[in-house]
């Protein structure tokens, strides 16, 4: 199996090393694992692509590259340059440091990398490690993802739904903020939304007197509705959420047509 991996935390992020280990387990001794990841931190860039300026790319080692772009850029660089036409059998994005559940899905570069792979017609999975009080004292905060990641991905490869429609299916996987031994299992869960974690800005003044703003988010430990992604994570389960690129509110189409059509 040929596997392409990327992330949004950058080429030197510890979660990428975790994903490389997961991918090596899946690829097997005769497989290939290719890494094309951002040269710098790209958290929060969602599905952005750098079509207004060129992207520098550097080979760091065998099958390992850093690109000065977003996770979606990295997927494009891999498919149309690095791999020289060879198609990966699977694209994995992560393992993100922090959860990409609930509204974080919409901001996540990790999810954006998987989304671009799906739009290119490839099976793709985004993986993230929820962090919390139970992971703070661990020598490896990615312990849960490292221990159970290959099994969860293999489960999706063997039993998951994959299709060839225009807005292809891909998966968002979040590992709960618990030690690996405390994992309670996995749950298929819809994307949820938190009520008190909206982003805002925090103003500051520089030493030279210039005003600047930091983007600030809310607490991540707030649960979503029962049975949705962040809620099951906080109960100790891996959340597995099928996603599509289609953002249409299909449940509102007929009602809107009746009102204004």
UniProtKB/Swiss-Prot annotation:
EC number: 3.1.3.5
Catalytic reaction(s) noted: a ribonucleoside 5'-phosphate + H2O = a ribonucleoside + phosphate
Keyword entries, A-Z: Cytoplasm, Hydrolase, Metal-binding, Nucleotide-binding
Gene3D superfamilies, sorted: Survival protein SurE-like phosphatase/nucleotidase
Cofactor binding mode and count: Binds 1 divalent metal cation per subunit.
This protein's record includes keyword Metal-binding: yes
Domain of life according to the entry: Bacteria
InterPro entries: SurE, SurE-like_Pase/nucleotidase, SurE-like_sf
Subcellular location: Cytoplasm
Record: residues binding a divalent metal cation: 8-9, 43, 96
First-tier enzyme category under EC: hydrolase
Cofactor: a divalent metal cation
One Gene Ontology CC term in the entry: cytoplasm
Single GO MF annotation: nucleotide binding
Record's function text: Nucleotidase that shows phosphatase activity on nucleoside 5'-monophosphates.
Similarity section: Belongs to the SurE nucleotidase family.
NCBIfam families: PRK00346.1-4, PRK13931.1, surE
Name under which the protein is recorded: 5'-nucleotidase SurE
Protein species of origin: Cereibacter sphaeroides (strain ATCC 17029 / ATH 2.4.9) (Rhodobacter sphaeroides)
């Amino acid at each position: 199996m040929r596997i392409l991996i990327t992330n949004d935390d950058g080429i030197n992020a510890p979660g990428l090393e975790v994903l490389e280990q997961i991918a090596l387990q899946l690829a097997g001794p005769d497989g290939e694992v290719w890494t094309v990841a951002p040269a710098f931190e790209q958290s929060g860039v969602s599905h952005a692509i750098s079509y207004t300026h060129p992207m520098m790319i550097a080979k760091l080692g065998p099958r390992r590259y850093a690109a000065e772009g977003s996770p979606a850029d990295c997927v494009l660089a891999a498919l149309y340059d690095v791999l020289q036409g060879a198609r990966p059998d699977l694209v994995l994005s992560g393992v993100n440091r922090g959860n990409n559940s609930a509204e974080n899905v919409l901001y996540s570069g990790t999810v954006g990398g998987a989304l671009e792979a799906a739009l290119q017609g490839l099976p793709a999975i985004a993986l993230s490690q929820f962090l919390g009080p139970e992971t703070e004292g661990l020598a490896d905060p990615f312990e849960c993802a490292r221990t159970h990641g290959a099994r969860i991905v293999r489960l999706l490869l063997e039993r998951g739904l994959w299709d060839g429609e225009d807005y292809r299916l891909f998966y968002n996987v979040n590992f709960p903020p618990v030690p690996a031994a405390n994992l309670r299992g996995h749950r298929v869960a819809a994307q949820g939304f938190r009520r008190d974690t909206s982003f805002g800005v925090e103003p500051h003044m520089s030493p030279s007197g210039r005003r600047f703003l930091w983007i600030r988010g809310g607490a991540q430990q707030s649960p979503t509705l029962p049975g949705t992604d962040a809620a099951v994570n906080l109960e100790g389960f891996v959340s597995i959420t099928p996603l599509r690129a289609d953002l249409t509110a299909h449940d509102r189409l007929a009602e809107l047509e009746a009102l204004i059509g």
